[in-house]
Amino acid sequence: MDSTRLLPDKKPVRNNQMPRKRGRKKDGLSVEEGKKALIHQVAQGRSIKDALTVIDRTRNTYERWRKEDRFFAQLVDSARLGGAQDIEREHLSFPEFSAKYLEAEVFPHTQNIVDLIDGKDPDWQHPSMTYEPGEKDLVMVNLPPEHGKTTAVTINYSLYRLAMDPNMRIIIVSKSQAMARKMLFAIKSRLTHPKYQNLQLDYGPPGGYAANSEAWNADRIYLSDDIRDSGEKDPSVEALGVGSHVYGARADLIICDVIVDMGNAHNFDNQIEWIQAELMSRISANGSMLVVGTRLSSRDLYSEIRDPHRYPEEESPWSYLAMPA
């Protein structure tokens, strides 16, 4: 996809409605600023009730934020557990983080994927796209090849989530173990290579992310015990080939990236059985799973796993977004 074709001059108006105005409360805080302020107050030791009083928001507003923004809910929960003294300085948006530490711009089609992972509707919609909302924890995205999804989402977004919350548990799945290992290697490099020193200094523990790590190998990594809850048994990031044994018991983010190719596109029944049995059961309470790739056939994993007849209620649970070139 030519990225220049994806950059809209203005966001499209949905459903023939007038664009919504993003209002500010009398204290001048936008919604995102209000969320950051609440996290700051909770990280300082205040209760949710007291924090809401300070930022002049209601309990209903807080509950709505939690429901609509899974990432916000995880950050608040981390702050409440007392292990988030760094939450305030870390709470950048993904585009801010990507630009500052990774020197990478987040384009609209990438932000759409991130929005869905975070439990939101895609911010940019176009008549050429297909969007079918479903459950917020099951996300499928189809788009043409060579769109940078692996670098921008599987690698950079996973890295962002680890920086925001070192207790994150991520599973990365690809068509082969070797391919998944390459994705994990890219994450490891950003956590240790001098090129990303600013990221490591601002977010990592004094000895580095790999110091005092339970494991730091080709298949899985545990962030340093100096920054991660030592009681957490599941890997920080685990790399799997489709159909492999899953080591971790739970995951906050599962990304299935390029698990279908011309060699296995016909094998969708086995792929679906493995995803439903081995992956969907491991999604944590506030977690989500993304399946992203390119359609290769009229019948493949991407179409068949959304078949309503595969589910007891005869309704597909997947939130689905297709973005053409």
Located regions from the model:
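Short, flexible loop motifs at catalytic/binding sites
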Residues: 1-26, 32-325
